[in-house]
Structures are given as structure tokens and as C-alpha cells.
Amino acid sequence: ATKLAIGYTLDEIENDITKSTPASFEPALDYVVVKVPRFAFEKFPEADTRLTTTMKSVGEAMAIGRSFPEALQKALRSLEKVGASFKWRTENLAELLEKIGIPTEFRLQQVQSALFNGASVDEVYKITRIDPWFLEQIRLINDQASLIANSGELTKELLKSAKMMGFSDAQIAELRKTNEAEVRQIRSNLNLHPVYKTVDTCAGEFAALTPYYYSA
């Protein structure tokens, strides 16, 4: 910014990440960053839990993934709060549709549950006005959850697709009605392990010199 202020042009400034391309080089991103606010209403029992234009969060969690569903699920788990991660349980749809009309701390989870329990994307959009693109991404997560729960066995392809959608071993175990250690052992036997990707601005086209990585 300082160099630009004194007259440098973008093509004269070095990209700090690659050290080999100019700042004018069009960035290409192969990752998604999701930030989720963290609330602490349990510490303030008399506070109004409805979300308004007033800031009520006490912090946030950030996650990086290769896709929006992966980054979203990782961010929710990073809140380290009971009820933050998605669950796939049978609930009363009418009650859920009533709840999602009021923006609260757990509205996102209620929207996910409503979609899982039979609500359509259009129906949820009319109540919440959440952009259908985001609702469709949540629906895809639910579809993957159903596939995990109802498949005969955990194949390498199924586990790989589940991980690409951001499912943890614990979530897969809950859907399969087994334990986390067993899922981890199956995954290990199938040679499926986390890898670490570099955060850069060129989608791996050039070597990045910044020590900034995320697991995927």
C-alpha cells in the first residue's frame, strides 16, 4: 500500500507470497475460508438471544477447506461448543420451520435440521431469506450424511467423499452407529490420511514461500 501511495504500479511490486510473480498477477484460489461467530449467551442468562444489528458475538472460528461444505463443517467444530456441529436426527419439521424464522445462535443448525427432515430449499429460503446457494450447500452435506448412514460398508470412495465434505471421524461414527476409533482404523487401513495444502494466491502454479498451511 505504501509503494502504491508513492507511485509504484502493481506490475512493479513483488508478490510477497510467491516472490516470483508481480502483484498485478491475477490471483487463483483453490480453497475456501469460512468464519463462524461464537456466542456466549450461557454466561449472560438475561441477555436477548435474538440476533439483530447489535454485535453479540464474543469471537469467531475460522476454517479453510477445499470446498465450502468442508470449511463450514470444520469451522463449526472449531467453535468447540455443544450443539455447534451438524446432527442428523429426526425432529418435528413444523417446530423447526417455526424456529428458523427467528435468528438465534443456533439458526444455522436448525436450518440444516429442517432441510434434513424434509423441508425444501425454497421453503427455507422464504422463511429465512438465506441465499439459496448456501442452503443448497447444506443440503449436499445432508445428502452425504444419508449416504454414509445407509451404505452397506465404508468404502474408500465413500470415506474420501465424506472427508471432502468435511465430516469428522466422530460424525461418521455417529451416523454409522459405531465408535470413532473403529472409523479411524478403517480409514487407516484404506490408507486415507490428512494432507496439508499451502495457502497461496496461484492455486499451486508457482511455489509459495509462506509457511501457511491447512489440512484437507
Report the location of each language-model feature.
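ATP-dependent carboxylate/acyl-activation modules
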Residues: 1-216
